[in-house]
Amino acid sequence: MKLLDIDFVLTVDRTLMTDHHGKEFIGFMTTAPPVFFPEKLWMWIAAPKPKVDEYGRPVVAPYGLRKVEASLLEKGFKVAVIDPDYLEPYLERVKAVMIGHHDYFAFCPPSSEWWMLTGREPVNRRYLLRLMRLIARVKKTRNPDLKVIVAGPAAWQWLYVPDYVDEFMVDCIVEGESGEKAIPWLAQRILDGEELPRYLYVGPADSPSVEEIPVIKGLSVNGLIEVSRGCPRGCKFCSVTLRPFRHIPLDKIEAELRLHAEHGVHDGILHAEDVLLYGAVGVNVNPDAVLKLHALTKKYYKSFGWSHAALATVVQAQRRFKLISRLADMIFDEHMDFLGFQTGIETGSPRLVERDMRGKAAPYTPREWPDIVEEAFSILHEHNMIPAATLIIGLPGETEDDVYKTIELVERLKPYRSMIIPLFFVPMGAFRRKDWFLSIQLREEHAELLRICLLHSIRWAKEIIGKYMPGLRYAPVRWAMRLFLAWAEYGARRATAETILGFVEQAKERMARQEAREPLVKRIKARISGVFGRQPVEVPARAT
């Protein structure tokens, strides 16, 4: 293999360095342990290896890495994204390896749910640990000056596992929006031989403006393109709302669309916390901006989806502007007959919405939330748009009545094509303990909610899978997915609330036994400066 003359390498483990067979939602399988299938087959389905060039550069890479790559290249640094299978020879010669991840240690949902329900380590955690062990081994034996920088949306997880910070010889943890300012600043310090902070927090005041966000230089996984950053809704449990709400200008979006189209990519994803709020001020839909965005996207992509959209925005857009109908008329044709995206229901309890997430219902009231959810699902079903919706189980102060209100809402949603995925609320502090899973205490009503959601999702998944993966190309994957769904449905139909609770307790016991068998990690001799305090470290306004 030929090697590039570079100073910095960007990488991530196999569960993210993949195109998931061109189907982004298949990637959610990497948040689970192998179930029913052996690990190699599970990974072939969920995370096949991408094509690489003669230097080990993947043809497609996660969008976040592409943004960091573009930022460093524009500032004159020698950098490349390298596939993990081709990483080792680069580690022997580069000055730094930079890793970005959505869920380093499987602490985020739905990884923590799968881990909790099965008692087995999800594959994303397994592959991340293997990657970090490789990096640490090379640093220890062949390149002691190598700097290891970890960043990305899940960088916070390193603060809860200081033993891994030590074991994997991590030099700097970067939390917050880091790609445009903090990472180039760190890169320059490395070249200048200056000391790196062990922990760097990039606060909202240091978030880049849209002018400072670069256009990517290489293809992203599944043609994903960012259209907005931040969220104006202000839910208590979500960190995204802390970031300023910004919209990427259409000319930058078009440059990234054109890049993909010129390389034969004609299917993709528009990424934002709420695509329907593109061009909006606050939560007030801007229909002209949304229509222009979709007309532009359709010019380059034959088919595409949204990463996320809010249910209250769906209702507002249709009630006020008939926008969902207008979008359906614009984008659906012989190449595209449905659109999928993620969204959040979180709860069917108006009381919890009022307390924790008033903005989720805006411009409507928390009291209206269950009706807003059902109306949104009805609108989406009518227009062949398919939501994958999350619920949060075990919010602080949640009562039995709150859970039953959520069960009632899920029952109302049965007629509508959708996936509904319940997620466990885990207090952040619990992750400091290896027995974090003991903090999750399920009650009978929680188990009933899990059972109802599973049956709902399996029912609709059997229909959706044919739309999502049509044709001979996907026949093997489609067959494997249907086999798995049949197995899951068999178990779900036989399950009761009592058996589910028993299953979860068995999983906890299994996890506890696994922890007891692991060799004891040496105690950290000295606290990592800044790790526990999480105090902001100021980043220069302009990195040079």
Regions found by a protein language model. Give the residues of each.
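Flexible glycine/acidic-rich beta-alpha junction loops that bind and position SAM and/or redox cofactors
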Residues: F105-S111, H271-G282, V315, I345-R358, ...
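Radical SAM enzyme core and accessory elements
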Residues: M1-P33, K78, C231, L455-T544
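Conserved SAM/AdoMet-binding glycine-rich loop
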Residues: L10, L259-P387, I393-L395
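N-terminal [4Fe-4S]-dependent radical SAM core
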Residues: H20-K23, R57, W185-I225, D267
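Catalytic cores of alpha/beta
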Residues: L159-F168, L323-I324, P396-R412
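Glycine-rich beta-alpha loop elements in corrinoid/cobalamin-binding modules
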Residues: G64, A80-V210
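N-terminal pre-triad scaffold of radical SAM enzymes
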Residues: D5-F8, D206-T241, E254, R258-E262, ...
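A solvent-exposed, charged loop/short amphipathic helix patch at secondary-structure junctions
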Residues: E24-Y55, Y104-L131, D356-T365, E445-L455
